[in-house]
């Protein structure tokens, strides 16, 4: 149609491009309800990002069948090229993994721990400067356990308390972008640096 007529949508036409991902390679360590939900939500929000899962072989196989991750392994070294590492296996597991991240992750990456506590923050000082740590506490109600209870919509409309531990504002803002991308609402928590007063997270 020419002139000033109305342009009708073309069926099967070119779709608008997906939003540019805030992170290119996201490694999620622990694919339970939280980790699996975050993996699925990230794949929806940022389809061009590579989502890497780290868990037991059985869980990795299930996550692959559910299309929650792109690749996975029970070996932490698969996270070596990640630019975001998410610790989603619970406080005790996060504290256990933290000392091994410097050897496993070769490049610069932001480390996001889902949940916190002294067991995690006290080990933050052992991380090199290229691995800044942020705590993220999503206000969600879990209705089950494990990867089968995960949902890409778990974080939609939910508040996240974001607390920098060794991270600078630029890294924290990137985590805010992640939270917004999966439908959440990031709010600032009071930071704690190693040797300072602990947060009530």
Residue ranges with predicted function:
Residues 88-90, 115, 164:
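Glycine-rich, N-terminal phosphate-binding loop of Rossmann-like dinucleotide-binding domains
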Residues 96-142:
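Glycine/small-residue-rich loop that forms an oxyanion/phosphate-binding "nest" at active or ligand-binding sites
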Residues 125-189, 193-198:
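Rossmann-fold dinucleotide-binding core
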Residues 2-75, 80:
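NAD(P)+-binding Rossmann beta1-loop-alpha1 motif at the extreme N-terminus of oxidoreductases
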Residues 23, 69, 82, 108, ...:
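Short, well-ordered alpha-helix to beta-strand connector turns
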Residues 18, 76-77, 103, 125-126, ...:
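Short secondary-structure boundary/capping segments
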Residues 75-110:
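Rossmann-like NAD(P)-binding element
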């Amino acid at each position: 149609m020419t002139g000033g007529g109305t342009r009708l949508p073309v069926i099967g036409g070119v779709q608008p491009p997906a939003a540019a991902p805030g992170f290119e390679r996201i490694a999620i360590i622990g694919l339970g309800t939280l980790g699996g939900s975050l993996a699925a939500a990230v794949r929806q929000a940022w389809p061009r990002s590579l989502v890497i899962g780290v868990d037991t072989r059985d869980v990795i196989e299930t996550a692959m069948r559910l299309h929650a991750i792109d690749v996975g392994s029970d070996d932490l070294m698969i996270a070596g090229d990640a630019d975001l590492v998410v610790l989603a296996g619970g406080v005790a597991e996060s504290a256990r993994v933290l000392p091994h991240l410097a050897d496993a992750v070769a490049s610069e990456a932001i480390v996001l721990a889902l949940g916190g506590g002294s067991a995690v923050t006290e080990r933050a000082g052992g991380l090199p400067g290229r691995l800044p740590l942020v705590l993220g506490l999503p206000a969600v109600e879990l209705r089950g356990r494990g990867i089968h209870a995960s949902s890409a919509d778990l974080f939609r409309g939910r508040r996240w308390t974001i607390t920098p531990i060794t991270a600078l504002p630029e890294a924290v803002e990137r985590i805010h972008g992640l939270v917004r991308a999966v439908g959440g609402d990031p709010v600032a928590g009071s930071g704690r640096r190693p040797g300072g007063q602990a947060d009530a997270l």
